[in-house]
UniProtKB/Swiss-Prot annotation:
GO terms for biological process: nucleocytoplasmic transport; protein transport. The gene is NTF2. Its main location: cytoplasm. The keyword Iron-sulfur does not apply. This is Nuclear transport factor 2. One of its GO terms (cellular component) is cytoplasm. Facilitates protein transport into the nucleus. Could be part of a multicomponent system of cytosolic factors that assemble at the pore complex during nuclear import. The lineage of its organism: Eukaryota, Fungi, Dikarya, Ascomycota, Saccharomycotina. It is found in: Cytoplasm. It comes from Debaryomyces hansenii (strain ATCC 36239 / CBS 767 / BCRC 21394 / JCM 1990 / NBRC 0083 / IGC 2968). Residues 8-121 form the NTF2 domain.
Amino acid sequence: MSVDFNTVASEFCNFYYQQFDSDRTQLGNLYREQSMLTFETSQLQGAKDIVEKLVSLPFQKVAHRISTLDAQPGSPNGDILVMVTGELIIDDEQNAQRYSQVFHLIPDGNSYYVFNDIFRLNYS
């Protein structure tokens, strides 16, 4: 059975951002020890270090709004590349911050985990 990579990408991003916005401490199950996060200029490897970084971000409340979501098959092995752009509403501020994020998803049984995660705020 063929996987609809667009559906997987959309469902993954909806779940990821809902979890991020409600309780970042619970994101660890989406990463593995070989996973890597580049957050602005910081690079971290391993689920524990990645979650520690995300939890340490200097805001209490955040809401992600996806503007665009593009996906492609990443390899014949079922990997999926996902590119997201959107807006962050931080601590109920009026002005949203624009961001870009790339996920490289790897199949893991009946689900996927994040192998690579690259996040950047977009300043203009």
